[in-house]
């Protein structure tokens, strides 16, 4: 398909009309009633994918809903579009590119020919170079300019070059086994870099500059400041021993002073928000090693295969994406909460924000026509039980419908005894997981509360309406493979929703104009230049106030 081909309006299809009628029939039905009608739904509406046990029974759906949603997916040619993406067809139509993040985790002995090239060979060639480099780093064979071992890698990137590595580093911290830690710098606010470097020793620090073009403003600004910090301490000759690059621009990498032999490449068919399993993960491989990184990739591939081969009716990412669309377009939900009951997944919701919202936050379809329905779920969240003491009040008794994904693990990597010295803190954590999904679903009625002797005037305040939908995702333990499975589960949900909405989930034109405006305003803010075009009164006043407070003429 090219960007010029018209895309049928999914809201004008019989499948959409059937779902609308179905919503009229069951939209007001409470989860209490769904479970009363079918007490076994908690054992029926479940899927196991790899190490993930996914319970979607606490959603406001029936078996009929699932079938109608699958019919909608087929009306949107989801299976054909999925196969096209996996085969390397240019499904990113606005940029005329393949979308092949799934190729990053294909086994070495497979083959995928795209534009005459076996991309699997290319991927594993880079993985081999990454592995050889990180082996040297981890063993101490690679030393800094002073001869000392590297004990800290600082990843400088932004967006997909930062959010993924930050999240995975925290999630897999227990797998760090070579005495190397990582820090991550992304914000152009100088406070970020200053804080990250404040207690580091230049001689034991390695910088990874992650920028495909090696021209990203924030990344190059931070990298230049980091370079100055290093050379002030160790001299210019130290740059080649303390800087490596993840990029495709050899000329600019060389000009920066980085030996291009220490440049790790990737491809235009890897979007930033889908790149954590590419060379963008170099900092992670340095910390956890090539074997754990390979396990991470294998987890992605498990879910990729399921997404490719499982029937839509039992395809986990497809069903979860369809359920998200059900809430967004038929029940009026605007956001989805992601609630990991694992402190190691503290950055998972922030990672998913970019993955989902940059992908599907579009108002124009791939053929250039306006969308005719809501798109782009708003993702947000916090770890349990922290969120319970912050925003769960709104989830339980507020007026907004917020479907939530609960993620938990049976076996903790860390555990401690409870106050009595006997119980498990992890058991206490997970008892909250199960209790919250139960109360969100079933609530507590006024009659039940009154029967407990609650004063009549207090009863309305204690009613828990329930009927708040959740997905429960359980795994045995948070391992590299399980983390890869979780990420791929959400990647393919994004694709599913994007296909049905008819949008291009793999471009991000909405972030470009603000960058250009910032470039135009910088000389106005810092010097005496006049703006290229008349500023609106608000921006003009703000700029003048800023200049005055910076000691510049207004």
UniProtKB/Swiss-Prot annotation:
<dbReference type="InterPro" id="IPR001672">
    <property type="entry name" value="G6P_Isomerase"/>
</dbReference>
<protein>
    <recommendedName>
        <fullName>Glucose-6-phosphate isomerase</fullName>
        <ecNumber>5.3.1.9</ecNumber>
    </recommendedName>
</protein>
<keyword id="KW-0312">Gluconeogenesis</keyword>
<keyword id="KW-0324">Glycolysis</keyword>
<dbReference type="GO" id="GO:0005829">
    <property type="term" value="C:cytosol"/>
</dbReference>
<dbReference type="InterPro" id="IPR046348">
    <property type="entry name" value="SIS_dom_sf"/>
</dbReference>
<dbReference type="InterPro" id="IPR018189">
    <property type="entry name" value="Phosphoglucose_isomerase_CS"/>
</dbReference>
<dbReference type="GO" id="GO:0004347">
    <property type="term" value="F:glucose-6-phosphate isomerase activity"/>
</dbReference>
<comment type="function">
    <text>Catalyzes the reversible isomerization of glucose-6-phosphate to fructose-6-phosphate.</text>
</comment>
<comment type="pathway">
    <text>Carbohydrate degradation; glycolysis; D-glyceraldehyde 3-phosphate and glycerone phosphate from D-glucose: step 2/4.</text>
</comment>
<dbReference type="GO" id="GO:0051156">
    <property type="term" value="P:glucose 6-phosphate metabolic process"/>
</dbReference>
<dbReference type="Pfam" id="PF00342">
    <property type="entry name" value="PGI"/>
</dbReference>
<comment type="similarity">
    <text>Belongs to the GPI family.</text>
</comment>
<dbReference type="InterPro" id="IPR023096">
    <property type="entry name" value="G6P_Isomerase_C"/>
</dbReference>
<dbReference type="InterPro" id="IPR035476">
    <property type="entry name" value="SIS_PGI_1"/>
</dbReference>
<keyword id="KW-0413">Isomerase</keyword>
<dbReference type="GO" id="GO:0006096">
    <property type="term" value="P:glycolytic process"/>
</dbReference>
<dbReference type="GO" id="GO:0006094">
    <property type="term" value="P:gluconeogenesis"/>
</dbReference>
<feature type="active site" description="Proton donor">
    <location>
        <position position="358"/>
    </location>
</feature>
<keyword id="KW-0963">Cytoplasm</keyword>
<dbReference type="GO" id="GO:0048029">
    <property type="term" value="F:monosaccharide binding"/>
</dbReference>
<feature type="active site">
    <location>
        <position position="389"/>
    </location>
</feature>
<dbReference type="InterPro" id="IPR035482">
    <property type="entry name" value="SIS_PGI_2"/>
</dbReference>
<comment type="pathway">
    <text>Carbohydrate biosynthesis; gluconeogenesis.</text>
</comment>
<feature type="active site">
    <location>
        <position position="515"/>
    </location>
</feature>
<dbReference type="GO" id="GO:0097367">
    <property type="term" value="F:carbohydrate derivative binding"/>
</dbReference>
């Amino acid at each position: 398909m090219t960007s010029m081909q018209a895309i049928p309006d999914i809201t004008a299809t019989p499948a959409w009309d059937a779902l609308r009628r179905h919503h009229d029939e069951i939209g007001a039905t409470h989860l209490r009633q769904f479970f009363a009608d079918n007490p076994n739904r908690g054992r029926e509406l479940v899927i196991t994918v790899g190490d993930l046990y996914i319970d979607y029974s606490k959603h406001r759906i029936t078996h009929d809903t699932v079938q109608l949603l699958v019919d909608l997916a087929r009306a949107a040619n989801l299976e054909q579009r999925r196969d096209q993406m996996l085969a390397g067809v240019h499904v990113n139509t606005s940029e005329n590119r393949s979308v092949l993040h799934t190729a990053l985790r294909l086994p070495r002995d497979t083959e995928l020919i795209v534009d005459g090239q076996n991309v699997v060979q290319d991927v594993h060639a880079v993985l081999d170079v990454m592995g050889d480099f990180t082996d040297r780093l981890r063993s101490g064979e690679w030393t800094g300019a002073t001869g000392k071992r590297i004990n800290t890698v600082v990843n400088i990137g932004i967006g997909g070059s930062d959010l993924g590595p930050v999240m995975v580093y925290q999630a897999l911290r227990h797998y760090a086994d070579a005495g190397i830690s990582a820090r991550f710098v992304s914000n152009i606010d100088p406070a970020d870099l200053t804080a990250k470097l404040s207690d580091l020793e230049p001689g034991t620090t390695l910088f990874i500059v992650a920028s495909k073009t090696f021209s990203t403003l924030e990344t190059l600004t931070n990298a230049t400041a980091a370079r100055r910090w290093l050379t002030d301490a160790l001299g210019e000759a130290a740059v080649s021993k303390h800087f490596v690059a993840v990029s495709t621009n050899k000329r600019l990498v060389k000009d920066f002073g980085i030996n291009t032999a220490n440049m790790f490449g990737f491809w235009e068919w890897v979007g930033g928000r889908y790149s954590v399993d590419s060379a963008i993960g170099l900092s992670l491989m340095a910390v956890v090693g090539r074997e754990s990184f390979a396990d991470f990739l294998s987890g992605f591939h498990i879910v990729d295969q399921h997404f490719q081969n499982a029937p839509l009716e039992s395809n986990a990412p497809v069903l979860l994406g369809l359920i998200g669309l059900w809430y967004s377009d038929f029940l009026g939900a605007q956001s989805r909460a992601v609630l990991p009951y694992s402190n190691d997944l503290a950055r998972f919701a922030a990672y998913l924000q970019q993955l989902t919202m940059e992908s599907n936050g579009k108002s124009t379809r791939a053929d250039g026509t306006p969308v005719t329905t809501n798109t782009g779920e708003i993702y947000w969240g916090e770890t349990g039980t922290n969120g319970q003491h912050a925003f769960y009040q709104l989830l339980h008794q507020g007026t907004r419908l917020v479907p939530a994904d609960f993620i938990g693990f049976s076996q903790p990597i860390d555990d401690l005894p409870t106050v009595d010295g006997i119980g498990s803190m992890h058991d206490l954590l997970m008892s909250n997981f199960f209790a919250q999904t139960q109360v969100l679903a079933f609530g507590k009625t006024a009659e039940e509360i009154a029967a407990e002797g609650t004063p009549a005037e207090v009863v309305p305040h204690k009613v828990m309406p329930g009927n708040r939908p959740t997905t429960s995702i359980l795994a045995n333990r948070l391992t590299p493979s399980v983390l890869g499975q979780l990420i791929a589960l959400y990647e393919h949900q994004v694709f599913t929703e994007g296909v049905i909405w008819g949008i291009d989930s793999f471009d991000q034109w909405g972030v470009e104009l603000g960058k250009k405006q910032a470039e135009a305003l910088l000389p106005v803010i810092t010097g005496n230049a006049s703006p290229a075009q008349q500023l609106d009164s608000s921006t003009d006043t703000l700029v003048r106030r800023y200049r005055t407070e910076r000691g510049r003429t207004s």
